[in-house]
Design a protein with these regions (language model features):
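N-terminal leader/targeting and accessory segments in enzymes
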Residues: 1-94, 98, 274, 292-297, ...
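Adenine nucleotide phosphate-binding catalytic loops in nucleotide-utilizing enzymes
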Residues: 4-5, 10-12, 190-197, 232-312
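Phosphate-binding loop of NTP-binding sites
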Residues: 4-6, 24, 61-64, 73-217, ...
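Glycine-centered flexibility sites
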Residues: 11-16, 56, 74, 112-115, ...
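Residues in the short beta-alpha loop(s) of Rossmann-like NAD(P)-binding domains
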Residues: 13, 36, 140, 218-219, ...
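Short linear Ser/Thr-Pro motifs
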Residues: 15, 33, 72, 113, ...
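Short amphipathic alpha-helical face segments that pack within enzyme cores
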Residues: 18, 122, 143-146, 283-287
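Surface-exposed charge patches
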Residues: 21, 44, 83, 125, ...
Length: 312
């Protein structure tokens, strides 16, 4: 018998298949189980990497002997198999947590109830336009774990849902963004808004003094919870209702972005995305770009030329 750590992946979608490939690349004993049917492309990927898997059922003896479980975000904690795993005391993590262990890239991570996909896409575009070597993942595009296994990027822009954050513990973003928080997915959080808010704020739990936390200071739910927690990160609010010394705000017909000693002004009429909500998204993206060291001219040009594209 070899003593390789056994990783069992539950769920054979984009997230699970990617996590299984990363586990294989890292030399673990890997098994993937999906209670439903696995899509042909993901089954083909698992076969290509010679990863054993099952679909249509869960075989307990092949799962409950795991050293660690990587759970796909769509599986609720209330699922019978998850309950059995928890009773055994087997550690459950998300694909994001797993991939983060092996990724040395700078990570810009975005969560929120609304606007996170647009904001993620904007930031990815900004970094690409700046000529940076950047990957896109999380809840959008290719599996983050699969990219960590098979590619090399200096930066990742990751859209992360509350379900993905639920099983993150040590994962460390360099820039964390919460676009806003409104009641959503409450069935997964015991119909308690506070539980959902705490899930979103998990994105901030490992931030360090040199990191940045970008948030909507016009969002009462976000501010209420922010006042209850301690974070060492640099706080960069964005707002359409007041002016801030550090962060982004509206000044008549333009967005003003202030980061450290620098200021970037962007006229609203130049933004490629219209609507008040997209002003917020553009503010968050511009702040992330400034914190990454991107030139003002590139930020302005990118926000003027961005066109929403389908990444999935």
């Amino acid at each position: 018998m070899d003593n390789k750590k056994r990783i069992v992946v539950l769920g054979g979608g984009e997230s699970g298949a990617g996590a299984a490939v990363l586990a294989k690349v890292k030399g673990f004993d890997v098994f993937l189980s999906d209670r439903g049917k696995i899509a042909a492309e993901h089954a083909a990927l698992l076969k290509k990497w010679e990863i054993p898997f099952e679909e249509g059922h869960h075989t307990e003896e092949l799962i409950l002997n795991a050293d660690e479980i990587v759970k796909s975000p769509g599986i609720p904690t209330s699922a019978p198999m998850i309950q059995k795993i928890m009773e055994r005391g087997i550690h459950i993590i998300s694909e994001i947590e797993f991939a983060g262990r092996y990724d040395t890239a700078k990570k810009i991570c975005i969560t929120g109830s609304n606007g996170k996909t647009t904001t993620t896409s904007l930031i990815y575009y900004l970094l690409k336009e700046a000529g940076l070597n950047v990957g896109l993942g999380g809840n959008i595009g290719k599996s983050y774990a699969y990219q960590v296994a098979t590619e090399h990027f200096d930066y990742y822009v990751l859209e992360i849902s509350s379900f993905q954050l639920d099983n993150c513990y040590e994962f460390h973003p360099d820039i964390a963004i919460i676009t806003n928080i409104t009641p959503d997915h409450l069935d997964r959080y015991g119909y308690e808004m506070e539980n959902y808010v705490k899930a979103k704020f998990r994105i901030t739990r490992n931030l360090r003094p040199e990191d940045c936390f970008i948030f909507d200071s016009d969002d009462a739910i976000t501010i209420n919870h922010l006042n209850k927690i301690v974070t060492e990160a640099k706080k960069l609010p964005f707002t359409q209702e007041t002016k801030v010394k550090q962060g982004a705000y509206l000044d008549n017909d333009k967005i003003v972005v202030k980061y450290e000693d620098d200021e970037c002004d962007i006229f609203l009429k130049e933004l490629s995305l219209g609507g008040k909500h997209n002003v917020y998204n553009s503010m968050a993206a511009a702040l992330a770009a400034k914190a990454t060291g991107i030139d003002n001219e590139i930020i302005r040009n990118s926000l003027e030329t961005f066109a929403p594209i389908e990444h999935r």
